[in-house]
């Protein structure tokens, strides 16, 4: 029994260290040399493993995009800064099931337990995307100031149109079919925002409803 308890304690300590090391990597810039090697690695793996890589993009065009990306890498980048540069190339392959994910922060067991007892922040709502605009589609919990039809103008003092322009290159679809993209964006932008800014307990919102503009905060709430 003592050995089992000792094993459990060592496992917990090891898990905490692993989470810590993983999250520390998010803030460590990767050298230019290694970034360029990673670009070549991604390119080679796509050519080797993707059976229909050139259905919607020519080999010459894809090669050019990877080569062009390498010329823009002139300083070390953090993992998710690099993700923002590489992901658009993956999107340009125009294969709906092919996606590059951000390097997410890992949570400790304590953080996971804490979040399990709370409702979400942005994912409590469904949204509609109309060009560079976001509207609230539903508000099941009837959160004040987030009525159905409310237009979100800014989040965390960042204009919605700027956020969506930044996130558009990360949303892929099959071929030239762009119809699906607005629905995918409506589902995914809260997750992309969270990957970029972290798991927040509250966030500042500027919104417009019935021609009235308000600034307020939405908060996580305990599950009751």
Regions found by a protein language model. Give the residues of each.
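Sec-dependent N-terminal signal peptides
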Residues: 4-13
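Flexible, low-complexity junctional segments that flank or bridge functional domains
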Residues: 17-224
